[in-house]
C-alpha cells in the first residue's frame, strides 16, 4: 500500500496471512478512495497516530465534523478480532476499536514507538517498510487526549499495482 502524506509517501506491507479480514477491509476502503482526505484526528506524541474515520473524519465530505471524528466508521459491518503475535512496534499498522474487541471497522493507527500493551489486544495487520520519517512528521495533538485542532490528513491511500 502507498499512503501519501503532506511530507511524502509511505509504503505499508500488509499481513493477509495474519489478519485476512482486516487486510481485505483496509484495501477495500483504500481502493474505493474512502480514506482520501481523512484526518489524523488523534495523534499522541510518543505513542501513535490514529485516522480512518471515513464517516466524520473525511475533510472533503459533507458529514465532516472534527468534533465527532473518531466516533464513526464505514457502512460495512464491524470486524471480528484477529489478534496475533505480531508485536505493536514502531511502524506497525493496527485497527482501532472501541472497548469491544470485535468492533474494528475503518479506523486505524500507526505506532510511533513500541507499544507492547496493545499486543494481542488490537489487530495488527501491517507495517511501514518505507517512509516512517514522514509518519513521524504528522502533526501531534494535545498531550492527554491526542485531539488535533487543525489535523494533517491522508492525501491518498492505494494498493500497489
Task: Label each PLM-derived region with a short phrase.
Residues 1-161:
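Cyclophilin-like peptidyl-prolyl cis-trans isomerases
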